[in-house]
């Protein structure tokens, strides 16, 4: 299984002080050496990664670059100019802390944007909710890749197997008894398995990501149809204590098949 290392949260740390440290390019070199792919989300408001980050990483890193971006003309034109290995189209809201759900596949610009990217040999992935309907739509749209949103799975795992319910970060919708949470967790995991199988059957390459960490990744690794995981925040958080190289290698060991 391949690991895409999302380095957005290195940029978060840099932007917190609006200085040039930590150096995102240095992080990209480490991610390229020990991971399989660099994933970077250039948001419309540029709150984390900047255009020059993407350009530098594409110019100087040998690793495949997976650009996450919304259906935004300015950023799509940047992608067409710089030509990352892949573009993963994601939904985006200005007020969100992180990507909250899968892409709306009925967006009028979506098909046209996919074709433009593919015409310059950029692979296209769609970040989607794990639903059979969205997988079928992705195949109709002729995307090469889908990335299944694992956020709900991750939230359920956290509610079941951590102390988050006793903290300010608890989710109100998951304020339920353990038996109910366990049932929902098993249902969501089974749904991810069915979606991965469906995607593969339709000829799509299947990735997964969002909220995955060192505690919850193992059940996802067992879904053989998923060929790649894109993981960022948990790796960067671990790197504060272990260093980025060790944090990546630790995750690589966990996802080894």
From Swiss-Prot:
The keyword Cytoplasm applies. 1-deoxy-D-xylulose 5-phosphate binds at residues 8-9, 43, 48, 98. 3-amino-2-oxopropyl phosphate binds at residues 6, 17, 211, 232-233. GO terms for cellular component: cytosol. The active site is at residues 41, 68, 210. This is Pyridoxine 5'-phosphate synthase. Keywords: Cytoplasm, Pyridoxine biosynthesis, Transferase. The record marks 147 as: Transition state stabilizer. NCBIfam families: pdxJ (TIGR00559), PRK05265.1-3 (NF003625), PRK05265.1-5 (NF003627). It comes from Campylobacter jejuni subsp. doylei (strain ATCC BAA-1458 / RM4099 / 269.97). It is found in: Cytoplasm.
């Amino acid at each position: 299984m391949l690991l895409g290392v999302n380095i957005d949260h290195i940029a978060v740390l840099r932007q917190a002080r609006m200085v040039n440290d930590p150096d995102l390019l240095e992080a990209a070199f480490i991610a390229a050496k020990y991971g399989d792919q660099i994933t970077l989300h250039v948001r419309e408001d540029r709150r984390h990664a900047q255009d020059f980050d993407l350009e530098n990483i594409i110019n100087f890193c040998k690793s495949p670059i997976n650009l996450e971006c919304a259906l935004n003309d300015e950023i799509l034109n940047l992608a067409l100019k710089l030509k990352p290995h892949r573009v993963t189209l994601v939904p985006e809201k200005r007020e969100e802390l992180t990507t909250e759900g899968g892409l709306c596949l009925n967006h009028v610009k979506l098909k046209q944007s996919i074709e433009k990217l593919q015409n310059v040999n950029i692979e296209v992935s769609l970040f989607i909710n794990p639903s059979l309907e969205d997988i079928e739509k992705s195949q109709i749209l002729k995307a090469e890749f889908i990335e299944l949103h694992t956020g709900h799975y991750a939230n359920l795992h956290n509610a079941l197997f951590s102390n988050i319910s006793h903290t300010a970060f608890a989710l109100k919708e998951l304020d339920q008894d353990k038996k109910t949470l366990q049932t929902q967790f098993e249902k969501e995991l089974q749904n991810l398995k069915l979606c991965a199988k469906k995607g593969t059957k339709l000829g799509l390459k299947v990735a997964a990501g969002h909220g995955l960490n060192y505690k919850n990744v193992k059940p996802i690794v067992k879904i053989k149809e998923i060929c790649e995981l894109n993981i960022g925040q948990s790796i960067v958080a671990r790197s504060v204590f272990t260093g980025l190289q060790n944090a990546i290698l630790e995750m690589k060991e966990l996802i080894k098949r």
